A protein has these predicted regions:
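Cytochrome P450 core scaffold surrounding the K-helix E-X-X-R motif
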Residues: 18-23, 27, 267-271, 288-291, ...
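Retroelement integrase C-terminal DNA-binding domain
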Residues: 110, 121, 156-175, 399-417
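RNase H-like nuclease fold core
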Residues: 199, 259-301
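Structured nucleic-acid-interacting core domains from mobile-element enzymes and related host factors
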Residues: 2-6, 237-262, 331
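C-terminal reverse transcriptase regions that engage the nucleic-acid substrate
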Residues: 51, 127-246, 251, 383, ...
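Mobile genetic element proteins and their domesticated derivatives, centered on retroelements
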Residues: 13, 29, 53, 65, ...
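Metal/cofactor- and membrane transport-associated sequence elements
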Residues: 1-124
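RNase H-like nuclease module associated with reverse transcription
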Residues: 133, 220, 253-255, 273, ...
Length: 417
């Protein structure tokens, strides 16, 4: 959004944020070691403010921050309660809060300085200047747009688990490999889980190209075998060769577009299908997911419909998020949701239901139709080789992975336009 609308991005940090919350209940604690009052050892301390370690500390801090901002005209985004905005006189500012990390998006430096000054008066703040690294994600801004990357995080993972000097792999997952449940003793289960845990954040933040592989391999964390390790090592080798990759947002087009896909019964041990979706905005991917479906489907059509239903839930949330931001042009158009199954599209556009369809399929069909009829989404057909959600459902060749990655804005940082 900053790339699309030319917003300036700055960053601040709240020092000891959880100590700022105001308590609603009476809470007492033992006198801390080294500060026990002589002769009053049996007495306890009554807390006047929130404290780190209290279960209500995060909630009290957020309520304090929320009251502080809304008191000076900021409005809470209805789709995300940690996003605030204020707009007037042709100027606007958006503030995003993640625990104690704050990103400030402004139309000019004047409004950003005003917000910084106000926050510094209310809380103990650290001004980090123009946004650089937040939540292990590095922001690079230039004339061509904004790039989000985690090359430093990838290098840290590879070094930690001994893959930094490994041979690179052309794809994160070998499509010819069929993984089955391990019936023997687990092979280094703790280390396997640690690697998967480290990769999950990377896959969800800036590397959609490894989402399917990580999602697939995470299903075997309880009892990994040697073949699961071989597949996991392939992901690490792929990261060795693509360490410098990041998502580049050129800012165009400033239109939200989605892609949905499913892979029906691709596993001999698991008869549940795999869903995948990705949404792009401003020239790059902004939301994506690869996951196993929670229900059993009886055909490819039902699997595709289930995946489409999951995609529409994300579509609705993303559209509400945009509609509640003043910098976005109104009205926000219906989200174009691309699907490569024509039978599903016919069913969505047909008002009649098939009596043979199971109840859970009918419910999902009705949900998709409701969003289509209300103007939230428009479902359209796209060829499989152009469906950006295809790599989120199965292992594919390097040519397909590279092509989809470029369409999602994912490319080496050193060759950014």
């Amino acid at each position: 959004m900053a790339a699309s609308y030319g917003l300036i991005v700055h960053q601040m940090d709240v020092k000891t944020s959880f100590l700022s919350g105001e308590l609603e209940d009476e809470i007492y604690m033992d006198q801390p070691d080294g500060f026990v009052v002589k002769g009053e050892e049996r007495k306890v301390c009554k807390l006047l403010k929130s404290l780190y370690g209290l279960k209500q500390a995060p909630k009290q801090w957020h309520e304090k921050f929320d009251r502080t901002l809304t008191s000076v005209g900021f409005v809470v985004n209805e789709a995300d309660k940690c996003v605030y905005y204020r707009h007037g006189g042709g100027e606007g500012v958006i503030l995003c809060l993640y625990v104690d990390d704050i990103l400030i998006f402004g139309t000019n430096m004047k409004v950003i300085h005003e917000v910084k000054s106000f926050l510094s008066k209310c809380f103990d703040m650290k001004d980090l200047g123009e946004a650089d690294v937040i939540l292990n994600i590095k922001l690079n801004k230039n004339e061509s747009g904004i790039t989000l990357s985690q090359s430093h995080y990838v290098e840290k993972i590879l070094s930690r688990f001994g893959f930094i000097d490994g041979k690179s792999s052309p794809t994160p997952y070998d499509p010819s490999v069929i993984l089955r449940k391990n019936k023997n003793e687990p092979t280094d289960q703790l280390r396997y889980s640690q690697i998967i845990g480290s990769l999950m954040y990377l896959a969800s933040a800036t590397r959609p190209d490894i989402s399917f592989a990580v999602s697939k391999l995470s299903r075997f964390m309880s009892n990994p075998g040697i073949y699961h390790w071989h597949a996991l090592e392939r992901v690490m080798r792929y990261l060795c060769g693509t360490m410098s990759y990041g998502i580049h947002y050129s800012g165009h087009p400033a239109v939200l577009e989605g892609y949905s896909d499913a892979n029906w019964i691709s596993d001999v041990d698991d008869i549940k299908a795999t869903s995948g979706y990705v949404f792009t905005f401003g020239g790059g991917a902004v939301s994506w997911r690869s996951c196993r479906q929670t229900i059993l489907t009886r055909s490819t059509m039902e699997a595709e419909l289930t995946a489409l239903d999951t995609s529409t839930v994300e579509s609705e949330w993303l559209r509400e998020l945009l509609m509640d931001l003043p910098v976005v042009e109104k009205p926000v158009p219906a989200i174009l949701l691309n699907c490569d199954n024509q039978t599903v599209i016919v069913k969505v556009n047909n008002s009649k239901d098939n009596a043979k369809s199971s109840r859970h399929v009918k419910r999902r069909l009705k949900s998709v139709r409701k969003l289509r009829n209300s103007g939230v989404i428009t479902v359209t057909y796209i060829q499989t080789d152009k469906n950006l959600a295809d790599p989120f459902t199965k292992g594919l060749s390097s040519n397909v992975i590279d092509s989809a990655s470029r369409e999602m804005g994912l490319r080496p940082i050193d060759v950014m336009p």
